Amino acid sequence: MTKAFVLLNSETGQEDDNLLKIKDFLIVKEAFRTFGVYDIIILVEEEDMKQLKETIFHKIRMIDGVRATLTLLVL
């Protein structure tokens, strides 16, 4: 299994909606609102790196109101 933390920056006012959408994804193990540069921290787990990349690019980053993400792979 490949695990990563994804730090997500949302458009102002869309943080709560984005958090609810993110929590619906099966690969999301945990997700929390935060204060600071990033609005949400997400723990994701996928079968391999290819699937993780696909999920981040084609699901998480495609949510309306997502401005930027930073992915930190767990070693």
Predicted segment positions?
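A compositional/biophysical signature of low hydrophobicity enriched in polar/charged and small residues
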Residues: 1-75
